[in-house]
Amino acid sequence: MPGQKIETGHEDIVHDVQMDYYGKRIATASSDCTIKITGVSNNGGSQQLATLTGHRGPVWEVAWAHPKYGSILASCSYDGQVILWKEGNQNQWTQDHVFTDHKSSVNSIAWAPHDIGLSLACGSSDGNISVFTARADGGWDTSRIDQAHPVGVTSVSWAPATAPGALVSSGLLDPVYKLASGGCDNTVKVWKLANGSWKMDCFPALQKHTDWVRDVAWAPNLGLPKSTIASGSQDGKVIIWTVGKEGEQWEGKVLKDFMTPVWRVSWSLTGNLLAVSDGNNNVTVWKEAVDGEWEQVTAVEP
């Protein structure tokens, strides 16, 4: 699978790359303390469109909001800030809001499924997870999970808004408000919003990794009768966690030991393909076979 090389113009390591909803622009986050927006086209061309400055430390992640809420990009940094950027005129970006709730590096951000509102989850080295939700008056409400992973939160990922099995059941279902998180305590945890506060929704925490969890990704379920979370760790393993009905125990299965740290795991939109990027500069794509085993279907050339 040959790739297209894109010159970002960053002057230091690029930590995150996110494509917008329409696949026309990418946002990149870098140790040079900036975010860059680059236009991309199918014929292989790319064009630098904007540079966003405001962070005072390396920028770890960027996340595009769903376009139904306008052209909004979130970023998080070692400086403890989460910045929301809004595009006014084309490629003219301004800081719309700066969240300074965290006192340490904010390592991960994720927008909730667009059906449940404009909500941003943030995980920090201070051990806390914060969730910022937009109000109709333009302000923001904040809910927190204090000491979610006391030694530091590395990653957050939202559950799909529809409950598992929704396609095969009838009647209206309440949207799902759940988060998965990974931390420096080597665990994956699941959280549920109930009566205005977040509570842990897995007992015990999901413990199969032997080193920091670097990334978690909750799979789109498309109404399938199970929930699936992938986690990648410093220990080199990717684990696929599944649970059937609400209240049952999560089961973890090792997809593979990559023998090098796993940095990112990412699901396809249909939830049947998982991309894994590892410390050897390899990106591999995996699919679950009929017998439940995972097999590699392709590799992306660096």
Swiss-Prot record:
Mapped WD repeat ranges: 9-48, 54-95, 101-142, 148-201, 208-251, 257-296
Primary location class: Golgi
GO cellular component, one term: nucleolus
Disulfide bonding pattern of the chain: none
Transmembrane segments: none
Keywords: Endoplasmic reticulum, ER-Golgi transport, Golgi apparatus, mRNA transport, Nuclear pore complex, Nucleus, Protein transport, Repeat, Translocation, Transport, WD repeat
Biological process terms in GO annotation: mRNA transport; protein transport; vesicle-mediated transport
Gene Ontology MF: a single term: structural molecule activity
Keyword Lyase in record: no
Signal peptide from the UniProt entry: none
Cellular location(s): Golgi apparatus; Endoplasmic reticulum; Nucleus envelope; Nucleus, Nuclear pore complex
InterPro entries per UniProt: G-protein_beta_WD-40_rep, Sec13/Seh1_fam, WD40/YVTN_repeat-like_dom_sf, WD40_repeat_dom_sf, WD40_rpt
SUPFAM superfamilies linked to this entry: WD40 repeat-like (SSF50978)
Subunit relationships: Part of the nuclear pore complex (NPC). The NPC has an eight-fold symmetrical structure comprising a central transport channel and two rings, the cytoplasmic and nuclear rings, to which eight filaments are attached. The cytoplasmic filaments have loose ends, while the nuclear filaments are joined in a distal ring, forming a nuclear basket. NPCs are highly dynamic in configuration and composition, and can be devided in 3 subcomplexes, the NUP62 subcomplex, the NUP107-160 subcomplex and the NUP93 subcomplex, containing approximately 30 different nucleoporin proteins.
Recorded family membership: Belongs to the WD repeat SEC13 family.
Chain's role: Required for protein transport from the endoplasmic reticulum to the Golgi apparatus.
Protein name according to UniProt: Protein transport protein SEC13 homolog B
